[in-house]
Amino acid sequence: MAKAKTPAVANTGAKPPYTFRTAWALLLLGVNFLVAAYYFHIIQ
């Protein structure tokens, strides 16, 4: 098989918008810890 000369992802030099997915990840992680604290009776 011949190698493709173009990359699979276009190299435009643009900064990917990681802030949106990072905000959602931190929010879900916080909710996860909140549910865990409730489950282990750390909070009532």
UniProtKB/Swiss-Prot annotation:
It is found in: Cellular thylakoid membrane. It is a single-pass membrane protein. It holds the Pfam family PsaX. The chain crosses the membrane at residues 23-43. One of its GO terms (cellular component) is plasma membrane-derived thylakoid membrane. InterPro entries: PSI_PsaX, PSI_PsaX_sf. Keywords: Membrane, Photosynthesis, Photosystem I, Thylakoid, Transmembrane, Transmembrane helix. GO terms for biological process: photosynthesis. It comes from the Bacteria. Belongs to the PsaX family. This is Photosystem I 4.8 kDa protein. The lineage of its organism: Bacteria, Bacillati, Cyanobacteriota, Cyanophyceae, Nostocales.
